[in-house]
């Protein structure tokens, strides 16, 4: 006779399909997002609930993520990987502004499924009572812009005056588009994409 594994708090019945240990990190992220959508708030997610949903010990979550903020960082890393992912064969034939647009749209499209939760993550990182998050966020933003330049294959050499100007401009662009995207309710993020195209048009 086969015995079902005991459920914890009735949550395990709704766990995402399980895989091997190698994909537990990804399942932790996915389950955290799912719980945030159910609760209506990222800050309401508790890692012990994530462990219950995945039917793993809470200590196993700690093996992969030090806290919920680290889970958020892993979610944003998916956007970064999409940004630097495969490009069309003719990518280098495009103007620089178009390459930048393709890369940024890839980032936003990847995170769009959980846009509201993503916005909550970002607001949490900016919370005035959490100054220990500020410096890492600044460095993460800088890293994102560096990878944007890499992904768009901008030719200016790192450390040159031109590269520095590009970084300042791309940082301002990214933040302005991000603020709009966080509250964009349009289908396919069309409002965000139109705004991005308008902002990039002067570069043509």
Q: Where in this protein do the model-derived segments appear?
A:
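Short, hydrophobic secondary-structure boundary micro-motifs
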Residues: 44, 119-123, 160
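Helix-turn-helix
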Residues: 2, 27, 35-74
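C-terminal peripheral helix-coil segments that are non-catalytic and often amphipathic
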Residues: 1-11, 150, 179, 183-204
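Hydrophobic alpha-helical connector segments
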Residues: 74, 88-120, 127, 138-140
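N-terminal positioning helix adjacent to the helix-turn-helix/winged-helix DNA-binding module
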Residues: 20, 24-31
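Amphipathic alpha-helical packing segments from all-alpha helical-bundle domains
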Residues: 130-156, 164-176, 194
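Short, basic, alpha-helical segments at the C-terminal edge of helix-turn-helix-like DNA-binding modules
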Residues: 76-84
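Amphipathic alpha-helical interaction segments
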Residues: 49, 102, 106, 120, ...
């Amino acid at each position: 006779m086969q015995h079902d594994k005991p459920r914890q708090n009735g949550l395990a019945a709704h766990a995402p399909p399980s895989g091997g240990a190698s994909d537990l990190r990804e399942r932790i992220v996915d389950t955290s997002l799912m719980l945030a959508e159910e609760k209506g708030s990222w800050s309401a997610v508790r890692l012990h609930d994530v462990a219950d949903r995945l039917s793993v010990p809470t200590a196993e979550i700690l093996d992969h993520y030090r806290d919920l903020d680290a889970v958020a960082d892993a979610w944003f890393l998916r956007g970064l990987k999409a940004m630097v992912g495969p490009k069309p064969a003719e990518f280098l034939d495009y103007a620089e502004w178009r390459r930048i647009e393709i890369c940024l749209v890839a980032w936003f499209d990847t995170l769009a499924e959980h846009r509201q939760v993503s916005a909550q993550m970002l607001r949490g990182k900016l919370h005035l009572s959490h100054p220990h998050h500020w410096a890492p966020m600044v460095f993460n933003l800088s890293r994102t812009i560096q990878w944007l330049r890499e992904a768009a294959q901008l030719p200016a050499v790192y450390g040159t005056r031109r590269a520095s100007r590009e970084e300042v401009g791309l940082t301002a662009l990214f933040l302005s588009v991000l603020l709009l995207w966080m509250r964009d309710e349009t289908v396919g993020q069309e409002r965000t994409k139109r705004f991005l195209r308008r902002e990039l048009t002067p570069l043509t």
